């Protein structure tokens, strides 16, 4: 046990952690030439393409130093803000962390939030400046930022490059010398912390865990504390490039368990595994149920694909327990599901995986967050969908979720960023200077305003320099109204949104203008209206396409022409009564990107 080292890597998106992890694996001969591909640990195609790590992964390496053999377990973490709970569990399974900072970009917001998480868990931090081979690298300045943040010595910071392999040996030595061995009791009752699970179509759910106390053997009868379910450990082992079965996994080591579990809901990240015969007194602290933050309706384009969509979502849920869904129906779109996601990136990934892995074409409605609606009798109801709102006369008040956001930016962009946050109803909490020209600004913002286009706007205002991180803060009372879009007097439920009173008129107007551009002209006039309750606040009209019915008349009597025009008018009127308006998918998406 004293020769085991468990460590994770903390880095912002794109700071090169997956590439550096490749070098560590290569250096310790974990990966040989034929298996070597870029980003060995990112095994979903989507992860490789987007260059982000979505799932946490783990891999074990052997390393020999000064004649002693060591076992190093690298637990790779996702760097994106949507997956921060997965990061926190991975961090809890480690004793040390490599803090990787890009030599060209410096410290970013998510690096800081994950770093604080690591410091709270008492991890030993090894600071590394990565990508020093870049022509635009500024290692000295980045080292200054790290020293200011960690209060460490300049000599402790390792300069490395994942591309050239510089500094890899130093990093491995530092892991062995500085990261403490796991502190567990081999004789205590079994406690394993689950930090991830993957779905295998043949073997069911495979849970990855770290043994905190005790040890787990093949064939043990074990219990998962949070779900209170019992299983037999059909196979346990360690995670090399592939899974390697062992007869037992000892204290402090990282391994996997296969017990024929069929659904991911039974394996919760952060749960504790213990023996049924000799159970641990309590679970490992820090387990929480992951709650979705963003909700959207997902509908199949062809109505008969509804059951296929359900099957696809269930399969995705096997691999991604944070996805929730329940059936709902919409007048405009037919039957579909209300899905809950951790955030916007998570939503995009689910959409892409539906498309790639299951060939499902879906329409996604405007995303919204969950609101707490209090009625006049004092009852409270969580609403995930604007159409589930009570009648306005019955509502006492509505509370919406607020987040505490931290934005790290160059001082040159403070003005525009503050304007953006104020436009999103943000409240400035405080600002702190990290170094001479970098500042961290804290805002309280309503989550509903962030959901749509905040991140894109932030990036474009700051020319890509600002980084953004957030966590849920509290619920606050807000004056929210339900905005409906009517086409020829018929409400389109999929376009309904909850919006703040102050923004409602401009939002309604912009929505009508946007829909006017996107809905194709029909043979009859289409009135697009935005309404709050019975009050119409904006209107646009799409002119009909018409045939020139009088073209065949030459001169002659005016009454002949009048008769034809009247006849056409009658026809148009009849069409308008029975005609339906097709709303293209582009229109639903355009609502998200209202500028």
From Swiss-Prot:
Domain of life: Bacteria
Enzyme class: hydrolase
Alphabetized GO MF terms: GTP binding; GTPase activity; ribosome binding; translation elongation factor activity
SUPFAM superfamilies associated with the record: EF-G C-terminal domain-like, P-loop containing nucleoside triphosphate hydrolases, Translation proteins
Gene Ontology cellular-component annotations: plasma membrane
Amino-acid positions noted as binding GTP in the UniProt annotation, renumbered to this chain: 14-19, 130-133
Coiled-coil parts of chain: none
Family annotation (Gene3D superfamilies): 3.30.70.240, Elongation factor 4, C-terminal domain (3.30.70.2570), Elongation Factor G (Translational Gtpase), domain 3 (3.30.70.870), P-loop containing nucleotide triphosphate hydrolases (3.40.50.300), Translation factors (2.40.30.10)
Annotated membrane topology: Peripheral membrane protein
Keywords, comma-separated and alphabetical: Cell inner membrane, Cell membrane, GTP-binding, Hydrolase, Membrane, Nucleotide-binding, Protein biosynthesis
EC number: 3.6.5.n1
Known catalytic reactions: GTP + H2O = GDP + phosphate + H(+)
GO biological process, one term: positive regulation of translation
tr-type G domain segment(s): 2-183
Phosphoprotein among keywords: no
Localization, UniProt: Cell inner membrane
Similarity annotation: Belongs to the TRAFAC class translation factor GTPase superfamily. Classic translation factor GTPase family. LepA subfamily.
Entry function: Required for accurate and efficient protein synthesis under certain stress conditions. May act as a fidelity factor of the translation reaction, by catalyzing a one-codon backward translocation of tRNAs on improperly translocated ribosomes. Back-translocation proceeds from a post-translocation (POST) complex to a pre-translocation (PRE) complex, thus giving elongation factor G a second chance to translocate the tRNAs correctly. Binds to ribosomes in a GTP-dependent manner.
Protein name: Elongation factor 4
Species in which this protein is naturally found: Porphyromonas gingivalis (strain ATCC BAA-308 / W83)
Gene behind this protein: lepA
């Amino acid at each position: 046990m004293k020769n085991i080292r468990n460590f994770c890597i903390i880095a912002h998106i794109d700071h090169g952690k997956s590439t550096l992890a490749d070098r560590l694996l290569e250096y310790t001969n974990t990966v040989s030439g034929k298996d070597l591909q870029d980003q060995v640990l990112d095994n979903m195609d989507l992860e490789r393409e987007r260059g982000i790590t979505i799932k946490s992964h783990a891999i074990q390496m052997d390393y020999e130093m000064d004649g002693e053999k060591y076992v190093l377990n690298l637990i790779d973490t996702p760097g994106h803000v949507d997956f921060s709970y997965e990061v926190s569990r991975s961090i809890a399974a480690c004793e040390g962390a490599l803090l990787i900072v890009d030599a060209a970009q410096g410290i970013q917001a998510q690096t800081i939030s994950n770093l604080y998480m690591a410091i709270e868990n008492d991890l030993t931090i090894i600071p590394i400046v990565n990508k020093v081979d870049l022509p635009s690298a500024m290692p000295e300045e980045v080292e200054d930022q790290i020293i200011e943040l960690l209060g460490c010595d300049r000599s402790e910071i390792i300069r490395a490059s994942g591309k050239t392999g510089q500094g890899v040996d130093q990093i491995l030595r530092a892991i062995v010398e500085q990261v403490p061995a796991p502190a567990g009791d081999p004789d205590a009752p079994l406690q394993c912390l689950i930090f991830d699970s993957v779905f295998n179509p043949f073997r069911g759910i495979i849970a990855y865990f770290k043994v905190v106390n005790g040890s787990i053997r093949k064939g043990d009868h074990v219990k998962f504390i949070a779900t209170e379910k019992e299983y037999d450990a059909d196979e346990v082992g360690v995670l090399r490039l592939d899974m390697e079965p062992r007869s037992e996994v000892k204290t402090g080591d990282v391994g996997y368990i296969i017990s024929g579990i069929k659904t991911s809901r039974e394996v919760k990240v952060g749960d504790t595994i213990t023996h049924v015969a000799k159970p641990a007194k309590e679970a490992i602290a820090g387990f929480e149920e992951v709650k979705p933050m963003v909700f959207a309706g997902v509908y199949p384009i062809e109505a008969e694909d509804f059951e296929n969509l359900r099957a696809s979502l269930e399969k995705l849920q096997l691999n991604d327990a944070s996805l929730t869904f329940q059936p709902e129906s919409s007048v405009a779109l037919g039957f579909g599901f209300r899905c809950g996601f951790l955030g916007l990136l998570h939503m995009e990934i689910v959409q892409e995986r539906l498309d790639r892995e299951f060939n499902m074409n879906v329409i996604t409605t405007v995303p919204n967050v969950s609101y707490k609606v209090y009625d006049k009798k004092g009852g409270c109801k969580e609403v995930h969908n604007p159409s589930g709102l009570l009648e306005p006369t019955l509502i006492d008040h509505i509370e919406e979720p607020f987040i505490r956001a931290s934005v790290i930016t160059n001082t040159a962009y403070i003005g525009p960023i503050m304007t953006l946050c104020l436009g999103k109803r943000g409240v400035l909490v405080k600002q702190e200077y990290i170094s001479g020209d970098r500042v961290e600004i804290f805002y309280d913002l309503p989550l509903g305003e962030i959901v749509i286009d905040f991140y894109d706007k932030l990036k474009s205002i700051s020319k890509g320099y600002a980084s953004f991180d957030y966590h849920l803060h509290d619920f606050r009372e807000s004056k929210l109204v339900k905005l409906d879009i009517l086409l020829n007097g018929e409400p389109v439920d999929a376009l309904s949104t909850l919006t703040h009173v102050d923004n409602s008129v401009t939002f309604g107007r912009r929505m009508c203008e946007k829909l006017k551009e996107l809905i194709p002209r029909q043979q009859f006039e289409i009135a697009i209206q935005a309404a709050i309750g019975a009050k119409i606040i904006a209107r646009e009209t799409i002119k009909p396409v018409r045939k020139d019915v009088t073209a065949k008349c030459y001169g002659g009597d005016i009454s002949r022409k009048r008769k034809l025009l009247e006849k056409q008018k009658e026809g148009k009127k009849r069409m308008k009564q029975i005609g339906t308006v097709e709303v293209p998918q582009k229109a639903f998406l355009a609502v998200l990107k209202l500028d």
